Amino acid sequence: MKLTVWTYEGPPHVGAMRVATGMKGLHYVLHAPQGDTYADLLFTMIERRDHRPPVTYTTFQARDLGSDTADLFKQTLQDAYDRFQPEALIVGASCTAELIQDDPGGMSETMGIPIPVIPLELPSYQRKENFGADETFFQIVRTLAKPMARTKQITCNLIGPTALGFRHRDDITELTGLLSDMGISVNVVAPMDATPTDIARIGAAHFNVLMYPETAETAARWMERELGQPYTKTVPIGVGATRDFIAEVAQIAGVAPYLDDSRLRLPWYSRSVDSTYLTGKRVFLFGDGTHVIAAARIARDEMGFEVVGLGCYNREMARPVRALARDFGIEALITDDYLEVESRIEALQPEMILGTQMERHIGKRLGIPCAVISAPVHVQDFPARYSPQMGVEGANVIFDTWVHPLVMGLEEHLLHMFRDDFEFHDAAGPSHHGGHSPKPQAAEPAPQAAPQPENTGTSVEVVWLADAERELKKIPFFVRGKARRNTETFASERGVGEISVDTLYEAKAHYAR
């Protein structure tokens, strides 16, 4: 454990809360101290849910540690059952409560509660939130699901969407429509909006659609083995992946593939002259493994970007992400330390970042546009409107989300470029009152340091002079990083310690040859 101001994933019990909050008729009794109730805010404030998570905390305090905290848990469990009357209960301990080793699962088995009580063993100091969600859903399915006769019509289950997931609500709607077009109905969506009764009939479907491997792959593998239900391997994010997904579903279900792409608006732009503006833009990707793998394919094959770096924070997806990075000829960054991510972005100087909420902050600090592609996200990425990531409409949404920071950045660049202009600077007043505006006082020219004598020896550390920094800001943001790198390389190779405006333009002339 370490002290940090940001974490990509919470402890495993937060993953369990995501599953419980997504479901109905399920209640989570969490053995936890008073301070661990912060997790409620994730769902009510950030996801903007209209109800609190179905979680009851024991909320023991320091003074309780001198008495029997086990009795406190038993009383809390009984009270939760009596008050909420759920169809099933899950019980576990938070990271802090794990240290006192009260064994909530063992205690719950001795109480004779007349509904399924599912114990969770979540190693808080070895694993994190996505593992917690995956393990929780697996334990629920393993306890409640049973083999049964298949439905007469071809049906499938959509598995993986949880509370606090990135656009999970809208992805469900989009995939339901895609499958309906092929004559396939949805039997159960789980965990999102499912009840324990729904989980009990999950075995009636012919196959499973694994939407998010991070939160449901263990359950999908178990159902394939125990219930005889194959599951899809393709995540339909992007045009190419959606077409591959349709083909995979058709093969599993034995139906004809069909995709209504009349709503698809991304390919026409890729064929247009305007799209050459995006070709070759250098992008860096970071997030959970599923979304990064999908986004890398879209960036390279559908948008014409150059992927200069990628990585993920969940180590469970490290192997496929590393394999993808090798295909791109780059090295994957597998870390949950946002400072390492910032250092890599700073070193690569991409023209755009595709990441999480943290990368949005990093982009603001470094002056690099950013689009969010993965959880964790903040409130603005839980929109009230329909905004999926999967399927046809998801491809349209991704197209808008990625292109707008680059296109709108041009307007912002022009505003910054003319910020010091005699007519448009901040002190000039409204432009239509130009004749009455006070004449701006001429600023004292900043003294320039004497240029360092050129040295043909080894490279030196270079410093940007103020006037050169101002001139650099006049260069459009999408090539500014490249201009900075080239100028610093040019100065370093020639032993110039301070970069002036002249050095900047000499470097430009040198690399233009």
Curated annotation (Swiss-Prot):
Key words of the record: 4Fe-4S, ATP-binding, Bacteriochlorophyll biosynthesis, Chlorophyll biosynthesis, Iron, Iron-sulfur, Metal-binding, Nucleotide-binding, Oxidoreductase, Photosynthesis
Cofactors that this protein relies on: [4Fe-4S] cluster
Residues annotated as transmembrane: none
Enzymatic reactions: chlorophyllide a + oxidized 2[4Fe-4S]-[ferredoxin] + 2 ADP + 2 phosphate = protochlorophyllide a + reduced 2[4Fe-4S]-[ferredoxin] + 2 ATP + 2 H2O
Pfam families from the UniProt entry: Oxidored_nitro (PF00148), PCP_red (PF08369)
GO biological process, one term: light-independent bacteriochlorophyll biosynthetic process
Family in the record: Belongs to the ChlB/BchB/BchZ family.
Entry protein name: Light-independent protochlorophyllide reductase subunit B
Organism per entry: Roseobacter denitrificans (strain ATCC 33942 / OCh 114)
